[in-house]
Amino acid sequence: PASHTKMVHGESAAVRFEMPYLFLDRHGNRFMDEGCCRMGYLNEFTKKYLKEVDFADSTAAKFFSIVPMNWEEHYEQWKDFSDISIHNAYRNVDPEAWIKGDTLEELAEGMIAYADEEGWAHDYTVEAIVESINRYNELVTAGNGDEDFGKRDEYMVPIEAPCYAVPRGANNIDALVDG
């Protein structure tokens, strides 16, 4: 077979989750249209975070996907018209590996604890994370589309507690595979 470029990903199979939920950057802020067609551009969207740390710490590009408890229902609705995946090769994602919070504040505290434990370059605060989730939910409730980033309406679903935070990472490097 022909050689091709493949990405070396920044997270394990248990959390490699290609669904368009709310993405929060190293500051706890939403930073992009999370729609499926945008995921391939993560390296471009996260360069500014690497620049903030003078390209000295690749963990500055790490982020969280905030996921509702009923995520599997959305997968069933979206899979027929969208390039989404809950699989990595033969393995499914594992919600047991995700951070769960019964309140948004508890979720934020868990995210901060995880990022600290993993040594991420971040400045998360509970307030910033909760504010970002609340703003996203305001957009969903208003029903006027995503005025902040332009995400497609069908992907605008509420994120209410209890919910999950999935640790994510932008692709680390391009690598040559099979060649």
PLM feature spans:
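Core nucleotide-handling region used for phosphoryl-transfer chemistry
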Residues: 135
